[in-house]
């Protein structure tokens, strides 16, 4: 999927407090992959990005909150080393303000990364450094897989002026 007019950034929201779970649910084991839920969720996003050969140099952004240290450790010791794609782990210090605060943190991070680039046009590799679209997903949705993300991104690509 290469287009000068379309570049999607991927943001995984992992900043909740897991109040009903009574602990860090993102470290619980995924029933199928046997990975921690955070490893599984980010892994599916990485797979979708790789499947589509997305046109963005931006890393996948993972926004953490209350459980930043343990989530950061899980990802640093697994997916970040395996994936050729960089993964940015960003701590939302205001996680207790709710989901909107994590979305804001993710967008602020994306804007800071893309502001380092002087143009919206693709690089020599044909990759965009500024997103035209952002896909947000929650880290605690164990049934979502790479194909679900591929479908959402393809639908967005086909309908770039609509929210998907």
Located regions from the model:
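Conserved beta-loop-beta/alpha segment of the NTase-like Rossmann-fold superfamily
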Residues: 97-164
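N-terminal glycine-rich phosphate-binding loop and ensuing alpha1 helix
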Residues: 2-69
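Acidic helix N-cap motif at the loop->helix transition within catalytic regions
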Residues: 69-77
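Hydrophobic/aromatic residues located in beta-strands of well-ordered beta-sheets
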Residues: 10, 59-62, 89, 134, ...
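Intrinsically disordered, low-complexity terminal tails and inter-domain linkers enriched
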Residues: 32, 47-56, 77-85, 111-130
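A generic structural signal for alpha->beta connector loops
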Residues: 24, 56-57, 84-86, 160-161
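Conserved donor nucleotide-binding strand/loop of the catalytic core
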Residues: 83-97
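Short glycine-rich anion-binding loops that position phosphate/pyrophosphate groups of nucleotides
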Residues: 16-18, 67, 95, 139-142
């Amino acid at each position: 999927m290469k287009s000068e007019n379309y570049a999607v950034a991927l943001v995984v929201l992992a900043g909740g407090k897991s109040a009903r779970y009574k602990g860090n649910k993102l470290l619980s084991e995924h029933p199928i992959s046997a990975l921690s839920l955070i490893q599984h969720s980010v892994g599916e996003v990485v797979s979708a990005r790789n499947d589509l050969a997305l046109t963005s140099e931006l890393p996948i952004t993972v926004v953490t909150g209350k459980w930043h240290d343990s989530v950061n450790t899980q990802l640093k010791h697994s997916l970040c080393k395996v994936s050729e794609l960089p993964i940015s782990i960003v701590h939302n210090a205001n996680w207790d303000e709710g989901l909107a605060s994590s979305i804001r943190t993710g967008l602020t991070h994306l804007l800071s990364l893309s502001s380092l680039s002087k143009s919206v046009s693709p690089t020599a590799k044909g990759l965009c450094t500024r997103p035209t679209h952002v896909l947000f997903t929650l880290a605690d949705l164990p049934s979502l897989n790479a194909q679900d993300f591929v479908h959402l991104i393809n639908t967005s690509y086909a309908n770039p002026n609509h929210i998907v």
